[in-house]
Amino acid sequence: MTDGTRELVIAMDGPAGAGKSTVARIVANRLGYLYIDTGAMYRALALKALRLGIPETDAAALADLADATEVELQRAPDGGNRVLLDGEDVTAEIRSPAVSAVVSQVSAVPRLRQRLIEVQRSMARAGGVVMDGRDIGSYVLPHADRKFYITASLQERARRRVAQLRAEGHEADLAAVEAEIARRDEQDMNKGVHSLVQLPESIVIDTTGKRVDEVVEEILRHCRRT
């Protein structure tokens, strides 16, 4: 908890692999806030679509799927999120390469996205939250108290993703991962009002070559200012 002052609503946006989820989780833990991983919510729906054989291009079926699906985030011991899909723990499975390949298109479906945004706004209403995603500061929480744009070079993001995948037991090729991230960047920057965008009021933090603890301390300094 904070020192008796109003608890903040903190928005973190940025491209895939920039480290925002890791940083957001730690910042939330340090502040005693709730961490909301919006990307995990979309990944859970993408996973269910894959299981049911629903193409990422079938917007109507995906929207219906969202209406019939329960995605729940629970606080994990490390301050992160435990992701439940219709009551099943899918925290690890949603990070698979197969899910990563379709989640950007799945998350672009308007009705699906709006349903999850309503849930996310409700979770943030009381304050004391750190939420990360692509359009948090611009659309989901436009009145957030602090807005951060977390970025890193494409090469750095690809290296991190490869390391993560290999640590989880997946095979990963650096060139293929870099191409996949570049493709996701292009998709994420062309989603209309939900596009990934660096806002004029956002505090930009480039994590290239920086340790996680350095980035966390930089963000906390901004959060503690009056």
Curated annotation (Swiss-Prot):
Catalysed reactions listed for this entry: CMP + ATP = CDP + ADP; dCMP + ATP = dCDP + ADP
Compartments, record wording: Cytoplasm
GO cellular component term of the entry, any: cytoplasm
Any Pfam family matching the protein: Cytidylate_kin
Positions contributing to ATP binding: 14-22
UniProt EC number: 2.7.4.25
Major localisation: cytoplasm
InterPro entries named among the record's database cross-references: Cytidylate_kin, Cytidylate_kinase_dom, P-loop_NTPase
Gene3D superfamilies referenced in this protein's UniProt entry, alphabetically: P-loop containing nucleotide triphosphate hydrolases
GO terms (BP aspect): pyrimidine nucleotide metabolic process
Parts of the chain that traverse the membrane: none
Keyword Nucleotide-binding assigned: yes
Keyword line: ATP-binding, Cytoplasm, Kinase, Nucleotide-binding, Transferase
GO molecular function, one term: CMP kinase activity
Domain of life: Bacteria
Family of this protein: Belongs to the cytidylate kinase family. Type 1 subfamily.
Protein name (record): Cytidylate kinase
